[in-house]
Amino acid sequence: MTTIPQSDFKPLEERLGYKFKDKGMLVQALTHRSYLNEHSDFPYEHNERLEFLGDAVLELIVTEYLYKNYANPEGELTNWRAALVNAKTLAGIATQLAFEDYLLMSKGEAKDKESKARMYILANAIEAIIGSIYLDGGAGAAESFIHKHILSILPFILKNQLYIDPKSKFQETAQELLGITPNYKVLKESGPDHNKEFTVGVFLDKELVAVGSGTSKQEAQIAAAQAGLDAKHWSVSMS
């Protein structure tokens, strides 16, 4: 049976700002489904049920905070909330908390550090940790964690308009600075119909600024726009 000494979690708990009464809740929050495929005798479930709970807790607490503290229209608050709870933001917070080395994954998943899948694994683990804190310490403990690690970055998001999606931001900036409206072209399609991969270029007039890929044209356009923001230094990093 695979076991983890409870004392090993002390540095992580200090970074999280929460000490678990039941360390098993923390272990489960850090356990990816793939780990159980290689460790059938592992005594804990994977983290997907905790993720399900944590997602709901996170959305409620963020929504309540925005409602109570800002009189902006519903549409704006929705965009702000999305910027706070999306996978990229949560994965960035997970990286800052340095708990990637604590994640329990299959050997294959553990090696694949730079993939989009890893970003979602990290984001889902944050939600699972929120769920585990909620069960272990109650709503107040979960709210404290969310305020400390997630809502604390709201001023940065608002200042840098990170709630605007990359396509909109790239277009607005290009029009403001250059007087040009970007256009997108599919440069490549690959893969079978059920698993297509699109490569899209974003152009300013005839200049190819950047490319992006995704499983849909829309996803590839968003990736290209983000790459364009980075290439033009019109983007601000969360790190």
Each PLM stretch: what is its role?
Residues M1-S239:
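Double-stranded RNA-binding/processing signature
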